[in-house]
């Protein structure tokens, strides 16, 4: 059996967002499940927009998610190889020189659209005589090159979409070499996939028409194409998510919002599939349950609040030995197991534990909360004597009810506000033993 080799090929022209991290996750998981290899390739032929800082940020995000690669390379290191294939395809008459300026091409496109026609290149340059081409060169025009798409049926079996069929006549010959000599994504990608023995490619369905053209490129290079799977697009409020329109960046999710790595990995590797989205604790366990056949063809709706709920579920499922290492990463190694177990059931983000440590160890500011001071002083007098335990809350509130007649929110909300300055959070029964008894009385009587 052929060894499974997948790849993820981001362009270092921006930060990773939830759309392309999904492709990275699924390619990694597919390779992992089949004991294969995963290759990281940087499509950096866009010289104007590609930046080292984006490459570094992409690698940082992947490492955070425990997406490790067996090999990595960038396309700029392979220009001589691409040039050799360019010459081969020119000899085979599958590449041809074009001399239109960007402005001329835009006019053609607008004219076609105004007539209700698809903006397919008219192959005007394919029919140029040598004299006409020479005249353009004398004018100082530099040629760009297009791949000649044969006007014949194209089909393949897609891992997600099933049978996909295209008519070559409906596809425009793509530009594969720009006028400045730089290569575009289309042909370089095929050459790389051939040279690195890529067997499976999972990517967004916005690449389906590209795949149809690339099928002919593989054929032109006498190679069997990889097996493709095209994921439905992730949408949020009826818009496709992409980095060019301000998609949700992974760096933002992990650094600013505080989502755990395995929450991100679990969520986006299961989103759009028939599998239940659960908070897996390791990439290995996630890979074991991964099934590419479970993914839907329909658009996938991403709701950030669903990810935050999953993050909460993950946090409360973690044992303290696991949490200890994460606490070091956020400079909170002073948190002990007892404190963690007391507050973790209500944490939304790991960093929230630092806030609750501060609340329990420093008197909060409640000056602007307009609390009922008489009630709080009365409650302080009724606080059970001796050591404060988890049972103290129920004993205390029963006594308060007996004396004041207060119940429910009228009883507990003023106490919560006076003790924590928060309307919500961990159960007060759990928080109470974390605060020194004298401090509890101080907070109640000075509110």
UniProtKB/Swiss-Prot annotation:
UniProt subcellular location: Cytoplasm
InterPro entries: aa-tRNA-synth_I_cd-bd, aa-tRNA-synth_I_codon-bd_sub2, aa-tRNA-synth_I_CS, aa_tRNA-synth_I_cd-bd_sf, Glu-tRNA-ligase_bac/mito, Glu/Gln-tRNA-synth, Glu/Gln-tRNA-synth_Ib_cat-dom, GluQ/Sye
Residues noted as binding ATP in the record, renumbered to the chain: 243
Keywords: Aminoacyl-tRNA synthetase, ATP-binding, Cytoplasm, Ligase, Nucleotide-binding, Protein biosynthesis
Keyword Hydrolase set for record: no
Biological role: Catalyzes the attachment of glutamate to tRNA(Glu) in a two-step reaction: glutamate is first activated by ATP to form Glu-AMP and then transferred to the acceptor end of tRNA(Glu).
Subunit structure: Monomer.
Protein known as: Glutamate--tRNA ligase 1
Organism whose genome encodes this protein: Rickettsia rickettsii (strain Sheila Smith)
């Amino acid at each position: 059996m052929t060894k499974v080799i997948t790849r993820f090929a981001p362009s270092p022209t921006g930060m990773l967002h939830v759309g392309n991290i999904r492709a990275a996750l699924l390619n990694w998981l597919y390779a992992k499940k089949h004991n294969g290899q995963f290759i990281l390739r940087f499509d950096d032929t866009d010289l104007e927009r590609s930046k080292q800082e984006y490459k570094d940020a992409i690698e940082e995000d992947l490492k955070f998610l425990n997406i490790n690669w067996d090999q990595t390379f960038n396309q700029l290191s392979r220009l001589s190889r691409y040039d050799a294939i360019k010459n081969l395809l020119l000899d085979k008459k599958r590449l041809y020189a074009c001399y239109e300026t960007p402005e001329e091409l835009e006019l053609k496109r607008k004219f076609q659209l105004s007539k209700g026609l698809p903006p397919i290149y008219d192959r005007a340059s394919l029919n140029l005589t040598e004299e006409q081409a020479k005249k353009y060169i004398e004018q100082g025009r530099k040629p760009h090159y297009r791949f000649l798409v044969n006007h014949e049926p194209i089909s393949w079996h897609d891992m997600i979409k099933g049978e996909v069929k295209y008519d070559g006549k409906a596809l425009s010959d793509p530009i594969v070499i720009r006028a400045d000599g730089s290569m575009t994504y289309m042909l370089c990608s095929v050459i790389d996939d051939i040279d690195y023995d890529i067997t499976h490619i999972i990517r967004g369905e916005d690449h389906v028409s590209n795949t149809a053209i690339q099928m002919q490129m593989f054929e032109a290079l006498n190679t069997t194409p990889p097996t493709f799977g095209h994921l439905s697009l992730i949408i949020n409020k009826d818009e496709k998510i992409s980095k060019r329109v301000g998609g949700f960046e992974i760096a933002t999710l992990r650094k600013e919002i505080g989502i755990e790595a395995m929450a991100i990995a679990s969520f986006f590797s299961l989103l759009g599939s028939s599998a239940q989205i659960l908070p897996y604790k390791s990439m290995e366990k996630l890979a074991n349950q991964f099934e590419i056949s479970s993914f839907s063809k329909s658009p996938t709706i991403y709701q950030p609040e669903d990810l935050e709920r999953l993050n909460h579920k993950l946090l409360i499922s973690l044992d303290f030995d696991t949490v200890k290492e994460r606490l070091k990463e956020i400079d909170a190694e002073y948190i002990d197991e007892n404190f963690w177990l007391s507050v973790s059931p209500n944490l939304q983000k790991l960093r929230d534990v630092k806030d609750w440590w501060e609340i329990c160890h420093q008197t909060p500011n409640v000056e602007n909360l307009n609390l009922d001071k008489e009630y709080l002083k009365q409650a302080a007098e009724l606080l059970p004597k001796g050591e404060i335990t988890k049972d103290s809350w129920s004993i205390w509130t029963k006594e308060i009810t007996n004396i004041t007649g207060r119940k429910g929110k009228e009883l507990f909300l003023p106490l919560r506000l006076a003790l924590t300055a928060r309307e919500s959070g961990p159960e007060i029964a759990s928080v109470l033993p974390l605060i020194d008894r004298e401090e509890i009385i101080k907070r109640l009587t000075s509110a």
